[in-house]
Amino acid sequence: SLPFGFPKVLVSSAAALPGLSTRFLRASDIFLFNSVIEIAGLTGLLRNVLDRAALVMTGMLHGPVTEPLTDRTKAIAMTMVSPCERCARAVRVQLEKEGYEVVGFHATGIGDRAMEAMISLGFFRGVIDLAPGGVGEHLYGFMRDAGPNRLESAGRMGIPQVISTCGVNHITPRKSKYTREHDLRRRYDLDRLRTWLRMSPRELKEVAALF
């Protein structure tokens, strides 16, 4: 619940557990410190870990840290993913020529949530939403799930929002949960680890209804 830019450090021996950091960090800009050893008994090793974590916090409190945004009236939020990088770059260049500061969010679900939260806090004057695929991902519970309030914050804040469609027609179920039907779909491989599957006509209609 602490705002973006407020110094935050979390020391945990479970920081590296799969899925745990995602569950607790969500859209927070918290510094996660993996202690490696259990936090029990002040041994020399644990003191070393805690000392370094304390120095991290000291640096954030007293170091020459740049303010999050120098002028919120010039800040524009923009979502993007790999397939629309060229478009995002062109949009950024044009807006910067007009004197705006463009803040990008990787639309992987967590990035979308972070953007919506920061819009609600008044960080931005406008939104360029190139990659709102998290809407459909939330509907079906897949990996880019951006939560139930995706696309809503800008309207509530009364700021302009331009919405495009990159990634809206694809889904990202975990490969370990692929069904036979998933294996038969057209696919788009972003890299060795990430694969998008084409939505069915029924799914496209269901997602379109949400927009």
What are these regions (language model features)?
Residues 1-6, 88-92, 141-146, 150:
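Short Gly/Thr/Asp-enriched flexible loops that form oxyanion-binding sites at enzyme active sites
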Residues 100-157, 163:
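A conserved active-site cap/scaffold subdomain adjacent to cofactor or substrate pockets
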Residues 17-27, 113-119, 169-179:
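Glycine-rich, charge-decorated loop segments at or immediately adjacent to ligand/cofactor-binding or catalytic sites
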Residues 142-149, 153-160, 166-167, 172-211:
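C-terminal non-catalytic interaction/assembly regions of soluble proteins
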Residues 2-25, 31-36, 103-107, 149-165:
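Short, acidic/small-residue loops that bind anionic groups at enzyme active sites
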Residues 19-83, 206:
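Cap/lid and interdomain-hinge subdomains that line or gate substrate/regulatory clefts
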Residues 73-109:
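Glycine-rich phosphate/diphosphate-binding loop of Rossmann-like nucleotide-binding domains
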Residues 1, 17-21, 84-89, 112-113, ...:
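Short glycine/serine/threonine-rich phosphate/pyrophosphate-binding segments
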